[in-house]
């Protein structure tokens, strides 16, 4: 029995990340090789962006994906999010030269307030929302607060890029396969303050912390490398990390939808107060996923160094939340 198509809304669909993302969704990499999809693609309602979106759709057509059951172009979230089962909010306003962070928060605040309200009005009541557009945690917080009729747990922010970056650095340091790394955690904000924590991580049952056994490397090389990786890629490539961000979005949604088989992954989720993180703060936590639901990994010990790092990233997030409080 073939499955009924699900509706996947993607914003910023003609952008760099959108271009790296859509073909992989349509090929079945995100929701499985037996799940047809209808793509509901949103771009800003100006002629140039809509024309570019049409070009992307022409290419999607030309791939003749068996799982692509339909697609639509939209300039309004109220139509783009209609009955959406999944929503990937990729589009956001990047920080321009000389733009203050407060200004960036305000501009994106308006975008994500409107998108949260639209999801609240027209999306499926079980819609799974992933915010990719930066500042991702705060944009997800705004969207969640703007959608009071949808469950809080349906809103998530993307920390998977930080998680994957951290795994890659650990694999390089230990000379082991990245696929064998388990129980890695990234706490906090998707920003250079995030705290990638390998204290619980294992490779084929062996402790990563014992293998590396170098706190100076952890504090002075590993954490800054992971935290500033996005800036390093812009410096090298002249463009932001679009393909790796799209890959992380696929990983995040696939694991949420199809499960992690008991493995830990990192998701930005609204806190319920665990680990001392105030309720509703959109924070990177370790989770496992099963039957379309994520579950927080609880009871992990937080040592003094980790607490200091968690406090630092929390402080930044609370500052961002305060900066958008007037919008909510």
Swiss-Prot record:
Q: Which residues form the active site?
A: 190
Record: residues binding NAD(+): 12-18, 108, 115, 132-134
Q: Which residues does UniProt assign to the signal peptide? A: none
What catalytic activity does the UniProt entry give for this protein?
(S)-malate + NAD(+) = oxaloacetate + NADH + H(+)
Question: Which terms under GO biological process does the entry name?
Answer: malate metabolic process; tricarboxylic acid cycle
Top-level EC class as recorded in UniProt:
oxidoreductase
Asked if the Swiss-Prot or TrEMBL record annotates the protein with the keyword NAD, the reply is yes
Sites where the protein binds substrate: 95, 101, 134, 165
**EC numbers, comma separated:** 1.1.1.37
- Keyword Metal-binding in the entry? The reply is no
Which InterPro entries does this chain map to? Answer: L-lactate/malate_DH (IPR001557), Lactate/malate_DH_C (IPR022383), Lactate/malate_DH_N (IPR001236), Lactate_DH/Glyco_Ohase_4_C (IPR015955), Malate_DH_type2 (IPR010945), NAD(P)-bd_dom_sf (IPR036291)
**GO function term, MF aspect, one:** L-malate dehydrogenase (NAD+) activity
Q: Its domain of life?
A: Bacteria
The protein's UniProt keywords, in alphabetical order, are:
NAD, Oxidoreductase, Tricarboxylic acid cycle
Which purpose does this protein serve, as stated in its record? Catalyzes the reversible oxidation of malate to oxaloacetate.
Matching HAMAP family:
Malate_dehydrog_2
* Family under the similarity heading: Belongs to the LDH/MDH superfamily. MDH type 2 family.
Q: What is this protein called?
A: Malate dehydrogenase
Q: Which organism is it from?
A: Variovorax paradoxus (strain S110)
Taxonomy of the source species: Bacteria, Pseudomonadati, Pseudomonadota, Betaproteobacteria, Burkholderiales
């Amino acid at each position: 029995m073939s499955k009924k198509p699900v509706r996947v809304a993607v914003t910023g669909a003609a952008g760099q990340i959108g271009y790296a993302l859509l073909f992989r969704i349509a090929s079945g990499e995100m929701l499985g090789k037996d799940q047809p999809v209808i793509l509901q693609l949103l771009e800003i309602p100006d002629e140039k962006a809509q024309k570019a979106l049409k070009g992307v759709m022409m290419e999607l057509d030309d791939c003749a994906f068996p799982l692509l059951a339909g697609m639509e172009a939209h300039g309004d979230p109220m139509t783009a999010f209609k009955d959406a089962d999944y929503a990937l909010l990729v589009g956001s306003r990047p920080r321009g030269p000389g733009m203050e962070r407060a200004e960036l928060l305000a501009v994106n605040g308006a975008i994500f307030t409107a998108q949260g309200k639209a999801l609240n009005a027209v999306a499926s009541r079980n819609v799974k929302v992933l915010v990719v557009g930066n500042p991702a945690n705060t944009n997800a917080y705004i969207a969640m607060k703007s959608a009071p009729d949808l469950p809080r747990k349906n809103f998530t922010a993307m920390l998977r890029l930080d998680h994957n970056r951290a795994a890659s650095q650990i694999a390089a340091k230990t000379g082991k396969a990245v696929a064998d790394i388990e129980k890695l955690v990234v706490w906090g904000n998707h920003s250079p303050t995030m705290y990638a924590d390998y204290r619980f991580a294992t490779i084929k049952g062996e402790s990563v912390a014992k293998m590396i056994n170098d706190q100076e490397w952890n504090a002075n090389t590993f954490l800054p490398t992971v935290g500033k990786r996005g800036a390093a890629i812009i410096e090298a490539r002249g463009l932001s990390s679009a393909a790796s961000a799209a890959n992380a979005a696929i990983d995040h949604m696939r694991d949420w939808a199809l499960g992690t088989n008991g493995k830990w992954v990192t998701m930005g989720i609204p806190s319920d107060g665990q680990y001392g993180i105030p309720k509703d703060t959109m924070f990177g936590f370790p989770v496992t996923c099963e039957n379309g639901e994520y579950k927080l990994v609880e009871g992990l010990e937080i040592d003094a160094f980790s607490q200091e790092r968690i406090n630092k990233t929390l402080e930044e997030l609370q500052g961002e939340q305060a900066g958008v409080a007037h919008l909510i």
